[in-house]
């Protein structure tokens, strides 16, 4: 009989793999060994030097439950600032210490342990379980989960539903399930005027004035009032610069960067179109030209409340005694890629210490998460 790994101990072992993006650090090798010993078919899916792991138990094409997570971590900073070395996986007084303890080697370990326990039971379940684990979530994200999903599609692999194991709970285990995320886009806006002497503004065209007018229009009123499942969209000016050290010179150019986190009342295209139209109107009046470039991290998405959401929420409620809030708050995650393939939710640990010096997680919380994942699998395939 295949032994079921202790998810807390597996978390500590994964932490000892120094997998700072883009280095794999041995974490995916360890995970493949653990899953392979339990009968999972494992494939390394590396693209452009980015390491990823696909693992499936059960027949291709069967009803399939998926899990998406990452083993890469952010840099630890100065190791001397840590109580215990950041890649020690130190275990003491019920805590596991190290970079990735919260985000999110613990989530990966919890699901791996839950899945191994589930698929090795007697009789074996009727269905398939997939783990799609990337080494590029904390970095650019272009060749991580995207590459896994492309690889799966090319080979006829699919997931019918998926959980992303990001730390979803703000303060207490079981208080929140992410059923969607806002979209995110960044716009670089450059205003081109005519340089001149500050004493003779009629001989110049001040790009700062035109740019400030555009920024005022964009920030003077909210983009919306929110929707049924989303808070109001937010637009933030994150950079304003003209690179001009002289107080008596009107600069030729001025630049701003804005970031928009938008709900399902908008698309990136509709927001981009609105901003360009406002810039064009100001340009026509001021004769200052605008050049705008747009980078879209992801569109907003929602997994509407229904059978899958109800199943996960019911298990969380039974295990924790809390009625989880169905939320779309926070930043982006790799769920923005998965949502194009199947319904996706995010549920994981409490995110108190993620990305901090002395990142750590209670060992019992990791074991509780594994129990929740195991019960979700059992309920899904019942």
Curated annotation (Swiss-Prot):
It is an enzyme of class 3 (hydrolase). InterPro entries: ArgE/DapE_CS, Bact_exopeptidase_dim_dom, DapE_proteobac, Peptidase_M20, Peptidase_M20_dimer, Peptidase_M20A. GO terms for biological process: diaminopimelate biosynthetic process; L-arginine biosynthetic process; lysine biosynthetic process via diaminopimelate. Zn(2+) 1 binds at residues 70, 103, 166. Keywords: Amino-acid biosynthesis, Cobalt, Diaminopimelate biosynthesis, Hydrolase, Lysine biosynthesis, Metal-binding, Zinc. GO terms for molecular function: acetylornithine deacetylase activity; cobalt ion binding; succinyl-diaminopimelate desuccinylase activity; zinc ion binding. Pathway: Amino-acid biosynthesis; L-lysine biosynthesis via DAP pathway; LL-2,6-diaminopimelate from (S)-tetrahydrodipicolinate (succinylase route): step 3/3. Its EC number is 3.5.1.18. The keyword Transport does not apply. It comes from the Bacteria. Binds 2 Zn(2+) or Co(2+) ions per subunit. Pfam families: M20_dimer (PF07687), Peptidase_M20 (PF01546). Its cofactor is Zn(2+); Co(2+). The active site is at residues 72, 137. Zn(2+) 2 binds at residues 103, 138, 355. It catalyses: N-succinyl-(2S,6S)-2,6-diaminopimelate + H2O = (2S,6S)-2,6-diaminopimelate + succinate. Catalyzes the hydrolysis of N-succinyl-L,L-diaminopimelic acid (SDAP), forming succinate and LL-2,6-diaminopimelate (DAP), an intermediate involved in the bacterial biosynthesis of lysine and meso-diaminopimelic acid, an essential component of bacterial cell walls. NCBIfam families: dapE_proteo, PRK13009.1. Belongs to the peptidase M20A family. DapE subfamily. Homodimer. This is Succinyl-diaminopimelate desuccinylase. It comes from Paracoccus denitrificans (strain Pd 1222).
């Amino acid at each position: 009989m295949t032994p079921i790994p202790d998810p807390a101990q597996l978390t500590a072992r994964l932490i000892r793999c120094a997998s700072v993006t883009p280095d794999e650090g041995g974490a995916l090798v360890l995970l493949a060994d653990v899953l392979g010993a339990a009968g999972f078919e494992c494939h390394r899916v590396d693209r452009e030097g980015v390491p990823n792991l696909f693992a499936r138990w059960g027949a291709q094409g069967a009803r399939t439950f998926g899990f998406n997570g990452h083993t890469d971590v952010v840099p630890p900073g100065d190791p001397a600032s840590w109580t215990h070395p950041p890649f020690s996986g130190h275990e003491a007084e019920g805590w596991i210490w190290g970079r990735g303890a919260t985000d999110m080697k613990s989530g990966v370990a919890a699901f791996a342990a839950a899945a191994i326990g589930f698929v090795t039971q007697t009789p074996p379940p009727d269905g398939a379980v997939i783990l799609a684990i990337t080494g590029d979530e904390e970095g650019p994200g272009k060749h991580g989960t995207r590459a896994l999903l492309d690889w799966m599609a090319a080979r006829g692999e699919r997931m019918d539903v998926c959980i992303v194991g990001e730390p979803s709970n703000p303060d207490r285990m079981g208080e929140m399930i992410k059923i969607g995320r806002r979209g995110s886009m960044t716009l670089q806006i450059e205003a081109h005027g005519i340089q001149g002497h500050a004493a003779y503004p009629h001989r110049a065209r001040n790009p700062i004035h035109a740019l400030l007018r555009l920024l005022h229009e964009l920030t003077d009123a909210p983009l919306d009032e929110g929707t049924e499942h989303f808070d109001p969209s937010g637009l933030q000016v994150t950079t304003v610069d003209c690179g001009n050290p002289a107080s008596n010179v009107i600069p030729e150019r001025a630049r701003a960067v804005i970031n928009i986190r938008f709900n399902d009342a908008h698309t990136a295209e509709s927001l981009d179109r609105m901003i360009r139209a406002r810039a064009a109107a100001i340009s026509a009046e001021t004769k200052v030209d605008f050049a705008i470039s747009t980078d879209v991290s992801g569109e907003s998405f929602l997994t509407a409340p229904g059978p899958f959401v109800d199943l996960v929420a019911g298990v969380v409620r039974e295990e924790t005694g809390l009625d989880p809030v169905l939320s779309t708050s926070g930043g982006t995650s790799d769920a923005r890629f998965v949502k194009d393939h199947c319904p996706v939710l995010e549920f994981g640990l409490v995110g108190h210490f993620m990305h901090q010096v002395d990142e750590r997680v209670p060992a019992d919380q990791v074991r509780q998460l594994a129990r929740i994942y195991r019960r979700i699998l059992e309920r899904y395939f019942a």
